[in-house]
Regions:
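Short, solvent-exposed loop/turn positions at domain surfaces
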Residues: 60-63, 103-106, 119-123, 186
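Internal intein/HINT superfamily modules and their associated LAGLIDADG
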Residues: 129-474
Length: 540
């Protein structure tokens, strides 16, 4: 070898070493501290159909023991969705006549801006921490046990479903929960086309609070200056309070010293209800003040305490939102809340045409967060609703939450309006079945991304979470495949670190899982994606 060639090889080796040192890890190290024997690093609860998280590492495959029976694939199906069977013609072994071996995918994630439904509200996944509770496909809130971050290069799938203002973007191997042929099942993005039904759960955990506590600052003048004290107070959680909150979300504004409600002069019944509820709940009088900007009515409550209470719901129209406890109210209280919001910002359309009868309920708001939250509140009342956005020239974007047949009857009962379902002309493609809201895919986009930060969660018990109002699978390697293998061909290491530059390298082929592992000159690609094309057709 020439001197120049030797120098180039040494420089290349040093460059590779530096690149490895500076590159971020694609996944985290298992476990962080604790080490356990291989036999106890997984568990499975057959009654719940869920893999229980534990300490575990990557898979180990004994090629001389694997018979290609597919049992590991069957065990992984609908749990981790990480194993796929691949054919290796060069691996001719007597016990595996088809040369069929398992490969494992270790990388599935979503972008960090994706909104996640947690017990503390709807927040971006970048703000979710270990110990937080997230909504799962069962409608329950379960604890996050791991948070994963990595860089991703590959295809990014983006879905938009009917009645959902949020778009869901996932990497090419991140399973989504769909409803097909009368049941739910996990599907990969490339298997989902136009008309496929994605799902979101109805919140099944309710809390009936007796009272709501809050704090407020009170100013005390003293001499030339003064001082503030932090006071604690509470109000009973009653129907009157829920209606007052609903009126505030629709028509209210709060500053440091007062709360005001701007209503139309014809809405006399609403004005009377606000005055009565303010007196009953807070013991405060609501006075009428002229509104120089319009011919409407302005009801004002001059109270620092009351203003502090209502500030938790947002002070401006585009900032209005419900606190976390309001998403889990029992139906009798949630109904009063929706009734008041509809009275202030709602509309019932009942039109007859020569060819059809069209009727629907709609609530309009400039708060994107509130529109998303109302979908869950209405679902808890047994009402399937849809949300859409409309850009307005020189005005804020408007979000409409709409209810069609077959949910008109229930919405009419909640809002106190005479209305009936219109079965012959149902316009609702949003379905509520078995505690799940189903909505069809209406937009699908696939793009190639490079070095994009993506994230994933590991969720205790249910192994799923709600992202952009759709159920996605979490990251879990439970080891159930190890328990399912009758030939002891699979094991899992108690401690491993996966560190790769590109997404493709996180797909471990049978050779890379083997003992000892070996890389091929031309790595295999996941057969799920080789030569695939996205189907841009209805129901494709």
């Amino acid at each position: 070898m020439s001197l120049g060639g030797s120098v180039r090889r040494h420089i290349a080796a040093i460059g590779t070493a530096i690149k490895h040192l500076l590159a971020p890890r694609m996944t985290v190290k298992y476990p962080d501290v604790h080490h356990v024997p291989i036999q106890t690093n997984y568990a499975f609860d057959p009654k719940r159909g869920a893999a229980l998280p534990g300490w575990r590492g990557r898979h180990l495959l004994y090629l001389d023991k694997c018979t290609g029976c597919n049992l590991c694939y069957v065990a992984c199906e609908n749990i981790a969705e990480a194993i796929v069977m691949v054919t290796l013609p060069e691996e001719k072994r007597p016990q595996n006549k088809k040369s069929l071996y398992p490969a494992v995918d270790y990388g599935r994630c979503i972008p960090p801006w994706t909104n996640i439904v947690t017990s503390d509200g709807i927040v971006p996944i970048r703000d979710v921490k270990v110990g937080d509770k997230v909504l799962t496909h069962t409608g329950r809130f379960r604890t996050v046990t791991k948070v994963f971050r990595r860089r991703y290069t590959g295809r990014l799938y983006t879905f938009r479903t009917l009645g959902n203002i949020e778009r869901l973007s996932v990497t090419e191997e991140h399973p989504l929960l769909i409803y097909s042929r009368g049941r739910t099942e996990w599907a990969f993005p490339q298997q989902i086309g136009y008309g496929s039904y994605l799902v979101r759960p109805v919140i099944a955990e309710y809390a009936d609070p007796e009272e709501i506590t809050f704090t407020y600052e009170m100013y005390h003048p003293s001499g030339r200056g003064g001082y503030f004290t932090l006071n604690h107070d509470s109000v009973k959680c009653t129907a009157e309070l829920m209606r007052l909150i609903g009126y505030y979300i629709a028509e209210g504004h709060a500053d440091r010293y007062r709360v005001s409600f701007d209503i139309d002069k014809k809405e006399v019944s609403i004005a009377r209800d606000i005055v009565a509820a303010a007196k009953t709940v807070f013991g405060e009088d609501a006075c009428l003040r002229p509104d120089g900007r319009s011919e409407g009515l302005k009801l004002v409550i001059d109270s620092v305490k009351v203003a502090s209470f209502f500030s938790q719901f947002g002070t401006r129209s585009d900032e209005k939102h419900l606190p976390p406890w309001a998403l889990r109210l029992p139906q009798h209280l949630a109904g009063e809340l929706v009734r008041a919001i509809f009275a202030g910002d709602g509309h019932y359309s009942n039109k007859y045409y020569d060819y059809m009868h069209s009727n629907y309920f709609t609530i309009r708001t400039t708060s994107r967060l509130l529109a998303n939250q109302l979908l869950y509140v209405l679902a808890g009342l047994g009402i399937g609703a849809s949300a859409c956005s409309q850009d307005q020239k020189h005005r804020k974007t408007c979000y409409s939450v709409t209810v069609h047949t077959p949910y008109i009857d229930k919405m009419a009962q909640v809002c106190g309006i005479e209305a009936r379902n219109n079965p012959p002309y149902s316009h609702s493609y949003i379905k509520l079945i078995d505690g799940l809201i189903l909505s069809p895919v209406i937009e699908l986009d696939v793009q190639n991304v490079e070095d994009l930060e993506v994230m994933n969660l590991e969720v205790e018990g249910d192994n799923s979470y709600v992202a952009s109002n759709q159920v996605v699978h979490n990251c879990v390697f439970c080891g159930f495949c190890v328990d399912f293998c009758p030939f002891y061909a699979l094991e899992m290491t108690p401690d491993v670190e996966l560190s790769e530059y590109r997404r493709e390298n996180l797909f471990y082929t049978p050779h890379e899982l083997a003992i000892p592992p070996r890389r091929l000159a031309r790595p295999l690609v996941n057969p799920r994606f080789e030569g695939e094309r996205v189907k841009h057709m209805a129901g494709g």
